[in-house]
C-alpha cells in the first residue's frame, strides 16, 4: 500500500472516531434536555444516507443500535497529493453546540394587577377621585336635608334591622317524642306551659288509636274516632295572653287504612297508637310594637298579637286555659237551614268544624236536610266571595259511581 494512502486512511479513522464522540455527547444532552422529544422529531425529518468508504466500499455498522438515525459518513474529495479533506454532511462543530434553554421559572403568588408603576398610580388616582366625589355628594345631601348622613354602611344596616322589631326572633325548633298510649295533646300543652315563649306546631308523624274531634255548631260536643289512623298533618299554636296564660288549639288530619280521611279541631284527646314524633317551634312576639301600631283604639285585644286560633273561645281542653283569641275569619261552608245563618265560624283547617271525606264504619250520621256548599260571589257570609263556581253535594246518599256521597253540579 502506498504510504500516502495509508496516512490518508488513518486520518479518516481519527476523524470518524472524533465525530462519533461528538454525536454521543449530543445524544446525552438531548436525553437530559426537557426538549428531547421536540429535537427527536426534528431528527426524524432529516434525510438518512448510507455512508460508504471510498477505499473499501463496505457498510459501516451503526453504533446506536437503531435508536437514532444512522450517523452520516464523510465524503472524500479527489486526492491531489497535497492535502486530504473530509466533508461530513449535517455535521456541527463542537463550538456550535449550545446548551438547551432552561424553562422560565414562574413566580409563586398572585400575579400583579398592574404591569407598570404608571398604571398602578393612575388607578390609585382614579379611586381617590371617586371616593372624594362620593363624599362630596353625601355632604351636599346632608346640607339639603338639614341632617347628617352616616358614612358607615354597617350602622345603617343595623338601624334598618332594629326598626323591624323583635317579632319572630329567637325561633327555636324542638322535637317531642311521645310513647304509645300517651296523649299527644297533653304532651304539647305541658311543653307550652313550661315554655316562656309562643309556640307553634310545625309537623308530626306517627299513628293514632283514639281521637276526639269537635262537632260543628249548633250540635256541639266531641265526636270520638277509634281505630288505626296515620297522622297526615298536625298544626296549631299557643300564644301568651296578658293574664299570663296561653290561648290556642290544635287541628289534625288523619288517614285510616281503608282510605278514609278525617280531620278537624281536636276536642279532648289524641291517643298515640305507636311512637309519635312532634316538631315544635318557639318564638318571641314584640307586643309593645304591636300595641303601638294598633293606634290605641281601647280594645283589649289590640294590646297583644291578633292571631287566628284554630279553636273557638272557651276553656281549652279542660286544662284551665284562658279564653281563646279573637277570630276574624269565616267558614265559607254553610248549610241550607236559615237558623244556621247567624253563626259565624272560623276559617281554614282547624276550626270548630270537622270534615270527613268518607263516613267511618260503625258511625251513622243523620241529616234533616241535605247540606249545600256554595263558593260563588252571591254568598253573603263568605268574605272571600267571587269564586265563580257553584258546587252542591248531598251527604248520606249512597252512589255506585262515587262511593259514599253523590255530587251534583247544576247547569
From Swiss-Prot:
It comes from the Eukaryota. Residues 54-66, 306-315 have a biased composition (Polar residues). Pfam families: PCC. Residues 105-117 bind DNA. PROSITE patterns: PPC (PS51742). Residues 165-305 form the PPC domain. One of its GO terms (cellular component) is nucleus. Residues 1-32, 54-164, 289-348, 366-411 are annotated as: Disordered. Residues 7-19 have a biased composition (Basic residues). This is AT-hook motif nuclear-localized protein 14. The lineage of its organism: Eukaryota, Viridiplantae, Streptophyta, Embryophyta, Tracheophyta.
Amino acid at each position: 500500500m502506498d504510504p500516502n494512502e495509508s496516512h490518508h486512511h488513518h486520518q479518516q479513522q481519527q476523524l470518524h472516531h472524533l465525530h462519533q464522540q461528538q454525536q454521543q455527547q449530543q445524544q446525552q444532552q438531548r436525553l437530559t434536555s426537557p426538549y428531547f422529544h421536540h429535537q427527536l422529531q426534528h431528527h426524524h425529518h432529516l434525510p438518512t444516507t448510507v455512508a460508504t468508504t471510498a477505499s473499501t466500499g463496505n457498510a459501516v455498522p451503526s453504533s446506536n443500535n437503531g435508536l437514532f438515525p444512522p450517523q452520516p459518513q464523510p465524503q472524500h474529495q479527489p486526492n491531489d497529493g497535497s492535502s486530504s479533506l473530509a466533508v461530513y454532511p449535517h455535521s456541527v462543530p463542537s463550538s456550535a453546540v449550545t446548551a438547551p434553554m432552561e424553562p422560565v421559572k414562574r413566580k409563586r403568588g398572585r400575579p400583579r394587577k398592574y404591569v407598570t408603576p404608571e398604571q398602578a398610580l393612575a388607578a390609585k388616582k382614579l379611586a381617590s377621585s371617586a371616593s372624594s366625589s362620593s363624599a362630596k355628594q353625601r355632604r351636599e345631601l346632608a346640607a339639603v336635608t338639614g341632617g347628617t348622613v352616616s358614612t358607615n354602611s354597617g350602622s345603617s344596616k343595623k338601624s334598618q334591622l332594629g326598626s323591624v322589631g323583635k317579632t319572630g326572633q329567637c325561633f327555636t325548633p324542638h322535637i317531642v317524642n311521645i310513647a304509645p298510649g300517651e296523649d299527644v295533646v297533653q304532651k304539647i300543652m305541658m311543653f307550652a306551659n313550661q315554655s316562656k315563649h309562643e309556640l307553634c306546631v310545625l309537623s308530626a308523624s306517627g299513628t293514632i288509636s283514639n281521637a276526639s274531634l269537635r262537632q260543628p255548631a249548633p250540635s256541639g260536643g266531641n265526636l270520638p274516632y277509634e281505630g288505626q289512623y296515620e297522622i297526615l298533618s298536625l298544626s296549631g299554636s299557643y300564644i301568651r295572653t296578658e293574664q299570663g296564660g296561653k290561648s290556642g288549639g290544635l287541628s289534625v288530619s288523619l288517614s285510616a287504612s281503608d282510605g278514609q280521611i278525617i280531620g278537624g279541631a281536636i276536642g279532648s284527646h289524641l291517643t298515640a297508637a305507636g311512637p309519635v314524633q312532634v316538631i315544635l317551634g318557639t318564638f318571641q312576639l314584640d307586643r309593645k310594637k304591636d300595641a303601638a301600631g294598633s293606634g290605641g283604639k281601647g280594645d283589649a285585644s289590640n294590646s297583644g298579637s291578633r292571631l287566628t286560633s284554630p279553636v273557638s273561645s272557651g276553656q281549652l281542653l279542660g286544662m284551665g286555659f284562658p279564653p281563646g283569641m279573637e277570630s276574624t275569619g269565616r267558614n265559607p261552608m254553610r248549610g241550607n237551614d236559615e237558623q244556621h245563618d247567624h253563626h259565624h265560624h272560623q276559617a281554614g283547617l282547624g276550626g270548630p268544624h270537622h270534615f270527613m271525606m268518607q263516613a267511618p264504619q260503625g258511625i251513622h250520621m243523620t241529616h234533616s236536610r241535605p247540606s249545600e256548599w256554595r263558593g260563588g260571589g252571591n254568598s253573603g257570609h263568605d268574605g272571600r266571595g267571587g269564586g265563580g263556581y257553584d258546587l252542591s253535594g248531598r251527604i248520606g246518599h249512597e252512589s255506585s259511581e262515587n262511593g259514599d256521597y253523590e255530587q251534583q253540579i247544576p247547569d
